[in-house]
Regions:
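Intrinsically disordered, low-complexity
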Residues: 1-72, 178
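Catalytic cysteine-centered active-site loop
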Residues: 72-123
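Aromatic- and glycine-rich peptidoglycan recognition patches
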Residues: 1-10, 136, 143-179
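Structural motif
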Residues: 124-125, 146
Length: 179
């Protein structure tokens, strides 16, 4: 039994802390959730993103897509589950989950977005990085709570945090894809 849980029903009271309100998360719809009825994929990603599972209930397609690709190895120029690069992953995700077509390269994706500040990032925005010191050279898709999904050269498709030392120093900005 954990704090806030009801041992008879297995439900857990959602944490309505101000950090979720600051993210614009729909606190008015949060309440109790029966853990046994929660989709395992959503539960997994709620833990990874450090947010209440209720927030993910309307985004099942996004997290099922991420789950299907998670761990896919990085391959420069790749565009399938045998290997994919960062811009291939972001364009595939945007097309399949959000029905938005974005260009194939990270540089072109950056040039074809409405720029947004880090504090304005919303789920589905693109996040851009200057990895090589020559402008945009890496892209990911923003999720929530400072987390983004991307195809990392070292780890393949993973979720990372914009606050991590490496990514915080390489972050160039965010972009909202034009529909």
């Amino acid at each position: 039994v954990t704090p806030g849980s009801n041992p008879k029903t297995g439900s857990v009271k959602a944490d309505n802390s101000s950090k979720y309100a600051a993210e614009g998360l729909p606190l008015n719809n949060l309440g109790s959730v029966n853990i046994e009825k929660v989709d395992k994929v959503l539960f997994k990603y709620a833990i990874m993103l450090d947010i209440p599972v209720e927030y993910l209930s309307n985004q099942a397609g996004l997290f099922e897509f991420i789950e299907d690709w998670y761990g896919t190895p990085y391959k420069y120029g790749g565009n399938d589950r045998k290997g994919i690069d960062c811009s291939g992953f972001s364009s595939t995700l945007m097309s399949n989950v959000f029905a938005i077509t974005v260009p194939r390269t990270s540089k072109d994706q950056y040039q074809n977005c409405q720029k947004v500040s880090k504090s304005e990032l919303k789920e589905g925005d693109l996040v851009f990085f200057n990895i090589r010191g020559r402008g945009v050279s890496h892209v990911g898709v923003y999720l929530t709570n400072n987390k983004f999904v991307h195809a990392s050269v070292n780890a393949g498709v993973v979720i990372s945090d914009l606050g991590e030392g490496y990514y915080s120093t390489k972050f160039m900005g965010g972009g909202r894809p034009k529909k």
